[in-house]
């Protein structure tokens, strides 16, 4: 057993070491390892677009779904040192959906070594979308940006993919007439790390966030510190990290649903506990010392899951779920897809049940 954990540690270290390498060099690695897929993602970069690239239906629509699977790309505002900033994505419109009908939107951020297709298949989010009546947006990291398709969740926010994802969400919601009061965000691992950044830095776009196997916010500024955070959580007070990064008094708050595997050897469960405290802080349930200022904290266990709930006026604001026997994988997912497990409850269904009770009002308050 120790040898297995050590192997996971070095594999994780290798991933994060690659993350810190200069991005232009990634093109060489992509051509050697996966030329066909890289071409599919990188080709649109040579074609300018006003809002998004030419959409097309296809590219492995998730099995068992009856809606429309659209593949395209978005031209986000350029970042420093990057004249072109294209972001590939998949959009799923549930069966019977009509343009401008005010559907809710769930934004899904995949993890390392995943694609929009694999994440949709593993979480079964599109099948749920058909039943529940929401659209699904799956941004996809390019191999030209990271050889393992990891999102850059640590370090300088402006150099991460967060601004591009925020721009994509705005463009898609505007183009399809989605309900801006019901836009939700979810991610796993590196995708959960980026989702935390978006919820903290771009809170007005999202009514709630779901984080699966994600690192604590604001603790990592480099490759090596990111690896340490994943393995151990933050050595600093997580509440102090939030206060140092944000004006908590001006933050509108974002309800959060957090899922973590008990035996995750890649992202330690302490991260989930600390994330719970951070989101309780921005929702103003905790004070600057991390003490409960309003509401209550409830704990209970059911069906091999330990729950910690932050409740205010009888309303669930933050929930942390630790799934017994689960490693670094999506709970209750399709085990045929990497980083998904059939162990534990269906995390996507649990997140949606939480999401559907949250709305972002026009007054920028949660109702």
Regions found by a protein language model. Name each.
Residues 1-105, 117-123, 131, 135, ...:
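A domain-start/cap signature at the N-terminus of enzymes
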Residues 141, 210-219:
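Active-site nucleophile loop of the alpha/beta-hydrolase fold
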Residues 140-160:
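Cap/lid segment of the alpha/beta-hydrolase catalytic domain
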Residues 154-176, 197:
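Alpha/beta-hydrolase active-site loop
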Residues 103, 111-115, 326:
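Active-site glycine-rich loops that stabilize anionic/oxyanionic intermediates
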Residues 258-260, 264:
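Short beta-strand/loop motif that positions the catalytic acidic residue
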Residues 177-189:
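Alpha/beta-hydrolase fold nucleophile elbow
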Residues 192-204:
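Short glycine-enriched nucleophile-adjacent loop
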């Amino acid at each position: 057993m120790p040898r297995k954990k050590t192997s996971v540690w070095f594999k994780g270290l290798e991933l994060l070491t690659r993350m810190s390498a200069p991005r232009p060099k990634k093109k060489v690695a992509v051509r050697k390892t996966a030329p066909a897929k890289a071409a599919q993602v990188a080709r649109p970069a040579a074609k300018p677009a006003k809002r998004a690239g030419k959409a097309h239906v296809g590219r492995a629509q998730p099995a068992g779904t009856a809606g429309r699977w659209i593949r395209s790309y978005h031209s986000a505002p350029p970042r420093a040192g990057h004249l072109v900033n294209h972001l590939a994505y998949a959009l799923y419109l549930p069966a019977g959906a009509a343009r401008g009908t005010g559907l809710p939107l769930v934004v899904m951020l995949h993890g390392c070594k995943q694609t929009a297709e694999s994440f949709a298949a593993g979480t079964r989010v599109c099948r749920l979308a058909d039943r529940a009546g929401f659209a699904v947006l799956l941004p996809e990291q390019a191999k030209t940006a990271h050889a393992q398709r990891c999102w850059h969740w640590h370090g300088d926010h402006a150099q991460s993919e967060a601004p591009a994802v925020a721009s994509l969400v705005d463009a898609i919601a505007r183009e399809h007439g989605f309900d801006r009061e019901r836009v939700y965000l979810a991610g796993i691992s590196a995708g959960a790390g980026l989702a935390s950044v978006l919820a903290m830095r771009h809170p007005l776009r999202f009514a709630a966030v779901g984080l699966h196997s994600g690192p604590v916010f604001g603790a990592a500024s480099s490759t090596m510190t990111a690896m340490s955070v994943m393995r151990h959580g933050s050595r600093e007070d997580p509440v102090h990290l939030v206060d140092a990064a944000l004006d908590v008094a001006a933050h509108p708050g974002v309800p959060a649903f957090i899922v973590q595997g008990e035996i995750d050897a890649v992202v330690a469960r302490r991260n989930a506990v600390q994330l719970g405290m951070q989101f309780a802080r921005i929702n103003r349930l905790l004070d600057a010392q991390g003490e409960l200022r309003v509401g209550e904290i409830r704990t209970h266990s059911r069906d091999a899951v330990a729950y910690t709930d932050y409740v205010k006026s009888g309303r669930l604001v933050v929930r942390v779920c630790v799934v017994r026997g689960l490693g670094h994988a999506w709970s209750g997912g399709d085990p045929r897809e990497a980083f998904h497990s059939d162990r534990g409850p269906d995390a996507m269904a649990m997140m949606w049940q939480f999401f559907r009770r949250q709305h972002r009002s026009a007054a920028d308050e949660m109702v």
